């Protein structure tokens, strides 16, 4: 009997970098209603790969299926179809969980425990010896920027949101995991808290950890991630490196002088005419042909600067395309 890991489309490596997360046509359908005869499709055939040592961002609007995908990968819920591997083993493998860290969105932390006691509890679940705990816990507190005094003396009900998030991050790292899942790690944090969380994630990346997280704060994702995927309405809209996705729609801000105004309007968006024959606009076409056209009409280029769209602009564009496609399908089905 052939294992699904042997199939040609489900290999564990690409070039020289092994994958640590891989899914193929992963699906999740929930049953609802009094008789459990109604179906809600939460995830529709998701196929993606996360490689060792990279920081991977999962993006999508509310209700897109991001948390469902995380729970499937972690083995918290079972898939309705498809297949997946986590660190080379099928999803749900108990032994793999020893090598994984997880920070959920808005985690419940035992408020009458101190941060230190909570980390001892988390370490005990992994059967980490007390001697190792005494060394590991102070190291983690230092990493997440929480003082030993606060961790030992204050009950967590007296912690700020940022302090709770840092304790949550420390417990996700208590077992020194190879792969770390973070569900909205910057949710509810102020700018300073986001900065500190970003620095923690970057330090983990520098240490060779693989990080899989979802977030609505796209500016932070753009600073941190190597690759991203966008989910919308349970479907994987796109995935790839930021350079691949954002670089595919590069634009150029062009400033020049002289030339035929009507021809320039055909090439440039947002064209503005200025005194003494100067003009500026945005170019989204092949700039080689544009430069040749400017020379032929006697104009000159003063400057041309590459202006890559932001992740936020790309994200909104992709979601709007997905919504438009969905409405078109619905409209056609009603004809």
From Swiss-Prot:
PROSITE patterns: ABC_TRANSPORTER_1, ABC_TRANSPORTER_2
MF term (GO), any: ATP hydrolysis activity
Keyword ATP-binding listed: yes
Keyword line: ATP-binding, Nucleotide-binding, Transport
Superkingdom: Bacteria
Gene3D superfamilies named in the record: P-loop containing nucleotide triphosphate hydrolases
ABC transporter domain span: 21-258
Residues at which ATP binds: 60-67
Keyword flag Protease: no
Annotated coiled-coil segments of the chain: none
Family designation: Belongs to the ABC transporter superfamily.
Matches recorded under PANTHER family: ABC TRANSPORTER ATP-BINDING PROTEIN ALBC-RELATED
Protein name from the UniProt record: Uncharacterized ABC transporter ATP-binding protein all4389
Source organism: Nostoc sp. (strain PCC 7120 / SAG 25.82 / UTEX 2576)
């Amino acid at each position: 009997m052939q294992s699904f890991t042997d199939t040609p489309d489900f290999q564990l490596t690409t070039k020289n970098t092994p994958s640590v997360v891989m899914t193929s046509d992963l699906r999740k359908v929930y049953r609802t209603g009094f008789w459990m005869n109604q179906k809600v499709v939460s995830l529709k055939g998701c196929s993606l790969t996360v490689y060792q040592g990279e920081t991977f961002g999962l993006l999508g609007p509310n209700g897109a299926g991001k948390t469902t995908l995380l729970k499937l990968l972690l083995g918290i819920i079972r898939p309705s179809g498809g297949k997946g591997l986590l660190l080379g083993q099928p999803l749900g493998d108990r032994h793999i969980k020893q090598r994984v860290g997880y920070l959920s969105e808005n985690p419940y932390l035992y408020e009458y425990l101190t941060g230190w006691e909570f980390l001892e509890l988390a370490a005990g679940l992994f059967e980490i010896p007390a001697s190792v705990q005494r060394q590991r816990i102070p190291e983690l507190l230092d990493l997440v920027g929480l003082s030993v005094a606060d961790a030992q003396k204050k009950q967590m009900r007296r912690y700020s949101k940022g302090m709770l998030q840092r304790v949550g991050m420390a417990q996700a790292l208590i077992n020194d995991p190879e792969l770390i899942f973070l569900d909205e790690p910057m949710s509810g944090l102020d700018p300073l808290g986001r900065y500190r969380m970003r620095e923690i994630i970057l330090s983990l990346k520098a240490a060779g950890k693989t990080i899989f997280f979802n977030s609505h704060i796209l500016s932070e994702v753009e600073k941190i991630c190597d690759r991203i995927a966008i989910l919308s309405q349970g479907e994987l809209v796109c995935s790839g490196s930021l350079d691949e996705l954002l670089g595919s729609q590069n634009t150029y801000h062009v400033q020049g002088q002289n030339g035929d105004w009507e021809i320039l309007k055909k090439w440039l968006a947002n064209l503005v005419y200025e005194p003494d024959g100067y003009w500026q606009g945005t170019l989204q076409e092949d700039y080689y042909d544009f430069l040749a056209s400017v020379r032929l009409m006697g104009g000159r280029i003063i400057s041309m600067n590459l202006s890559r769209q932001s992740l936020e602009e790309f994200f909104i564009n992709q979601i709007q395309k997905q919504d438009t496609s969905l409405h078109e399908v619905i409209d056609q089905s009603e004809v």
